[in-house]
Amino acid sequence: MRGALQAVALWGRKAPPHSITAIMITDDQQTIVTGSQEGQLCLWSLSPELKISAKELLFGHSASVTCLARARDFSKQPYVVSAAENGEMCMWNVSSGQCVEKTSLPYRHTAICYYHCSFRMTGEGWLLCCGEYQDVLVLDAGTLAVLHTFTSLQSPDWMKCMCIVHSVRIQEDSLLVVSITGELKVWDLSSSINSIQEKQDVHEKESKFLDSFNCQTIRFCPYTERLLLVVFSKCWKIYDYCDFSLLWTEVSRDGQFFAGGEVLAAHRILVWTEDGHSYIYQLLNRWAQMGATLRTFSGLSKCVCPADGGVLKGTVYPHLLCSTSVEENKSLHFVMGYMNERKEPFYKVLFSGEVSGRITLWHIPDVPISKFDGSPREIPITTTWTLQDNFDKHQMVSQSITDHFSGSRDEVGMTATITSSEYIPNLDKLICGCEDGTIFITKALNAAKAGLLEGDSLLKDSPCHTLLRGHHQSVTSLLYPHNLASKLDQSWMVSGDRGSYVILWDIFTEEILHTFFLEAGPVTRLLMSPENLKRSDGQILCCVCGDHSVALLHLEGRRCLLRARKHLFPVRMIRWHPVENFLIVGCTDDSVYIWEIETGTLERHETGERARIILNCGDDAQLIRSEPTLSVASETHKHKSIEQKSSNSHQPGPVPCPSVQLESSCKVADASSVPRPFNVLPVKTKWSHIGFHVLLFDLENLVELLLPTPLSDVDPSGSFYGGDILRRAKSTVEKKTLTIRRNKASCSSLQTEAQAKPSGDSLVLGDSTSKFSEENNGIKRQKKMKSSKKAHPKPPRKVDASLTIDMAKLFLSCILPWGVDKDLDSLCTRHLSILKLQGPVSLGLASNEDLFSLMLPGWDACSTEMKEYSGVNLCSRKVLDLSSKYTATLLHQTGIPRGLESHCDSVQQSDAIVYLLSRLFLVNKLVNMPLDLACEIDRPFKMETVHSKARFPGSDILNISSFYGHPKNGGNECRAPEADLSLLKLISCWRDQSVQVTEAIQAVLLAEVQQHMKSLRNTPVSSQPDPVAEHSICERMQISAKMEWTEELELQYVGKSSPLKTSVSPVKHGNDLNSANFQDTEDILDRCVLEESESAGQPRHRPWIAKVCSCRMC
């Protein structure tokens, strides 16, 4: 399990499109939530003065959003649920912008209602859903799992709209639903709770045809408990809820189509149309003589009619009071809603969202009245706003990553439209294909710094970039093959365009090596075959085209191997048969085409259950995402799906289909020997355009690369308790075993990262885990390596130290709250060489399941508490309070070196940066820790840890000296002092208080930087010889062990293993394993010594020395 990745959005000057398809206002009336055709949700701040400002974009859906609804009692949990056309459902915390639950169901919802009866049901309540399927689904509001179905006895059909009726008089709840054929159905919710819990059928209690089609809205009048408003496309009707008798019908005029309505008050309704017009009616002559007194009243059963058997003698007559003013644009489609439950100042608000992305608010008066002559009064627009308004007002901070490169500008001077993008981590190169066919290559880190930081005038004036010209149409796809095929040339790059041309480039010499013409549609995807494909001539390139065809190209041989053109539907998935050399193509209609690569013939075509079995077996699937709604993180998995899926093959157990087993798993990652702490992801907001880029920072990888000792070389078995060197040597095998277990578990979690961590950085990932080999034309597992076999030496990590430090400095520049303390800003710039931001940046988080949340420019425009901090890089006012509390706890800590000299060198700067990053990494881990595991960690707070010898799950985190300082007095045991416990308890309290990860990181960074710079503010410098450099070795090594233990602890939680027993001493473990693997231990020790840097004038890092020696120099 890995924490969330820190993200920084480089928006550019143009806002991403946000075609609104659903809109709602939260119950606290502070946030507007909109769903879009592009699949994103947008959170808009709503001030008490009804001012709007876009706050945050949420990425979680890969299809258009169809409906929104609240998913909890909002006063307790601010949760909103969203549904998409492809069946995806997400539950969002609108306060933090994080997705708390996600599922995918084979249903397309058009309406969702939240229902919870506190005194009759347990759990979080129900989500009642209807849509393009029969009847009504009942979902668990906590897990989004299907609980039951409300079924129809008469005329089952698709349901179009619904509402929940709460009857105060009889204390009963009912569900009213109207089908697409105009049939009204009533279910009793109160009496169905027990039936649903017992899984019994629940049928409707009443039904009635309403003699109209295409119902848009049904609303119950809670003020009279008698009126029922039903809005159809061409008319709206008023019914008596008692017996569903028709009271009035109003037909649309001038070709307008009604889209919805609400009940404003007793006998007053609001109806709106598809083009954004709305009308307020007063219902006159509301009730005539009723005849005999009603003997019964139920919201579910019909009332008793008068004795003569007649119907209601009176009807209602609507009188038009008011209408709303609308900017005339009949080509746009509006989605509208109404909110009349605002707290003080008790506004009644009509709101609308347009396809253009504009939100409009009208303040509805409490008592609408017409003019003196009886004509309707016009209600003016109160507020209107778009995403682009945010960008225009705060354009200074919305720099695109390509704004400073002249090669990306057309003849008019405007920035060229980017249609495809690819980042090469090994070379730190960003490759962008443009609509005019040009491709430019630049240094990604330099481009990001030029767009975000001050003081890079030289870079902005003369940026270093390369232009490639060879395409005559829009470049639609890019691929760097060496990332996926380690045997291919590092200089190769492949691009495809809309004209079905594929060009093989040499990016170093800027030459065209070969041009392929596929004679098909636009090239939409470029994929590499897995390395286990049994071909003597190497790996092949797969091209997916817009006309549903697939082509296979051999890059080294410069020839086309296969053109598959018989697919009737778009290609959804590509699979490879590693033994028989088959290409398996899955289409969106769930059909499968199996092609023989050698001959180019169609082997067979399967549909139905057989096709699903073929698609579901094996682990080498490459998903082809749909272009129009591309989530941010999908680009990460586009090329990495092989290594992520195949990591599951490390797990023991049978494989579903032996014919398509995968031989190797993580070989793809061998092409990159450096972890990816920094990544650049393109976001396609339209089907053919890259809207913006997102910078991703992986704190764990960043800290790992900056440490002098790899994590796998550090003993994670707990602590730096002194002992003798022989025992440390004997326990080396134990360290190896623990690392194996961690890495095997980590393989399955690689998909949670924006970029998978390469296996070259792990000591035993590629050598000691289960391997595969081909025997008798099949693929079987080999057993683990015998202890008698020598382990292959780990290749040295090829890390550009200066590049990694630049990544760390860029991250700190983006996170640091610039502007809070100007003196602190200048000290950071001067002594840490961290450049100041040009303005506040848009921060965000990338979670584990393709879920992103990104702040928008000017997100704090409506925040009253942030007005005094305008222009400050603060994610919230809460950061300052958290930082003060952290500083108060920090002052009681001893043993941790803080403070810089006035003339510090680059080594001291690097050590300070590593220390700051390690702190942020630990805070990120603690705040993101699951609640169950956090409870185990919090348990030692309530016990006497000084005299207790028991080991609790999670209590090891208290004994890691990297977080709390060094072992005191050189003792064998490092106990956390009370001040350190209070620090950990403080961060744990932040998690319980729903503090966001970004807020916690900013607060800790601000407090730590203030402590580091404290010595520079005062003229006298402390004479204590305690510089950072003296402690850097020990401290870094201890940070390594802390990271190891955090991962080990989380893996035990994820794997749901048995509770940890009392830890066994290293002596016993070492003796148990040493009997079989002592020779292997000696090899590792010898190799570790040989691999150490022997440069003159530089100290050689010996992690084991720090464990035996108590002096600070070691």
From Swiss-Prot:
Subcellular location: Cytoplasmic vesicle
Main location: cytoplasm
Residue positions, PTM Phosphoserine: S1093, S1095
Residues forming coiled coils: none
Record keyword Repeat present: yes
Cellular component terms (Gene Ontology): endosome; nucleus
Cross-referenced Gene3D superfamilies: YVTN repeat-like/Quinoprotein amine dehydrogenase
The entry's keywords: Biomineralization, Cytoplasmic vesicle, Phosphoprotein, Repeat, WD repeat
Knockout or disruption consequences: Viable with no gross morpholgical defects. At 6-7 weeks of age teeth have an opaque, chalky appearance, with reduced enamel thickness at occlusal surfaces. Body weight is reduced, probably due to problems with chewing hard foods. Enamel formation is abnormal from the maturation stage onwards with significantly reduced mineral density and retention of proteinaceous material in the enamel matrix. Tooth enamel hardness is ten times lower than wild type. Attachment of ameloblasts to the enamel layer may be weakened.
Renumbered residue ranges of the record's region Disordered: 634-658, 749-798
Pfam families attached to this UniProt entry: WD40, WDR72_alpha-sol
Secretion signal span: none
Tissues and organs where the protein is expressed, per its UniProt entry: Expressed in maturation stage ameloblasts (at protein level).
Bias (Basic residues): 780-796
InterPro entries, per the entry: Quino_amine_DH_bsu, WD40/YVTN_repeat-like_dom_sf, WD40_repeat_CS, WD40_repeat_dom_sf, WD40_rpt, WDR7/72
Mapped WD repeat ranges: 15-54, 60-102, 160-197, 327-373, 413-452, 470-515, 566-605
GO biological process, one term: microtubule polymerization
PANTHER family xref list: RABCONNECTIN-3B, ISOFORM A, WD REPEAT-CONTAINING PROTEIN 72
Function as written in the Swiss-Prot or TrEMBL entry: Plays a major role in formation of tooth enamel. Specifically required during the maturation phase of amelogenesis for normal formation of the enamel matrix and clearance of enamel proteins. May be involved in localization of the calcium transporter SLC24A4 to the ameloblast cell membrane.
Protein name: WD repeat-containing protein 72
Record organism: Mus musculus (Mouse)
